[in-house]
Amino acid sequence: MKESVQRKLESLTERFEEVQALVSQPEIIADQDKYRALTKEYSQLEGVVKCFADYQGAQGDFESAQEMMQESDPEMREMAQEEYKSSKQAIEQYEDELQILLLPKDPNDESNCFIEIRAGAGGDEAAIFAGDLFRMYSRYAEARRWKVEVVTMNEGDHGGYKEVIANIIGDGAYGVLKFESGGHRVQRVPETESQGRIHTSACTVVVMPEVPESEAIEVNKADLKIDTFRASGAGGQHVNKTDSAIRITHVPSGIVVECQDERSQHKNRAKAMAVLQSRLNKLEEEKRQAEETSTRRNLVASGDRSERIRTYNFPQGRVTDHRINLTLYRLDDVVAGDLDAVLEPIRQEHQADLLASLSDEG
């Protein structure tokens, strides 16, 4: 292990012990903001500090085994040989784990997120596909015990959605789903297709971290145009009799957000403002990324429709992720919400890219 890495791990261990002592102090417990910040720091440090302690234990075993191998007793030497092998293997394993644990973290990874799905080329079929994608993400969220709250939905004429925006609430939701931003393409035979021809349709998905109020971008009220309108209900049921739906336009950026999910205008306005904050935050992030000179590829796409990230081919039961050339013949499972089969290889590739960029810098 490099000396610089060893020093960093020792310093993190010291800080962990310091935080551990602080969180048990009555004056810290009484100050909720400080206590929350310290418990968050504690949980962020815990994994890497435990892994470093295991690494040090294996290092100690390795050194003991080396000493024992000098013994005159053949039985002791044989035992030492076994210990030498297993501790060397453990050291290598912990070094790999520590490398990943020390990778720079995206500060938004632990956040809730907003997911926007929009039907693109393909008319009714694209809207039906947007409905399939929304169900896929909802089932995935449900399996992880995350909560899904619809912000707004614009239903398609023959099922699905022209657009749907949902808030996904749960630890690490953004960190897991951020790789879903981009163009999603479907190839299948529509139910209305009598000739059995395969049609291609597309949707765009944008995943944005929810911005905590404390970090919200200051928005000048004069820059906002707010319209109210009557919410539309499916098939005339539960149609809102008041103008409770909200449309907020941020004039300088041209961003428009609608929310008509709640019956209360006040709640719809709060939800729309939260989405607006996330979109403004995303704009800022994209500007920052554009200014960076790094040539490292970015597996977290912006959600631009031209960035096709994945194809779902129903006749072949195939899912292809174009960013990492991954092909799986498990389409039904993936669409049913078993997204980890796709997300895990992407996450690993992302980690490998980060490791490679750190090696280049080093």
Curated annotation (Swiss-Prot):
A GO CC annotation given for this chain: cytoplasm
Localisation: Cytoplasm
Q: Tell me which SMART domains the record gives.
A: PCRF (SM00937)
Give the protein name, as stated in the record. Answer: Peptide chain release factor 1
Record's family?
A: Belongs to the prokaryotic/mitochondrial release factor family.
Task: Fill in the PTM field for this protein.
Answer: Methylated by PrmC. Methylation increases the termination efficiency of RF1.
Positions of post-translational N5-methylglutamine modification: Q237
| Species per Swiss-Prot/TrEMBL record | Pseudoalteromonas atlantica (strain T6c / ATCC BAA-1087)
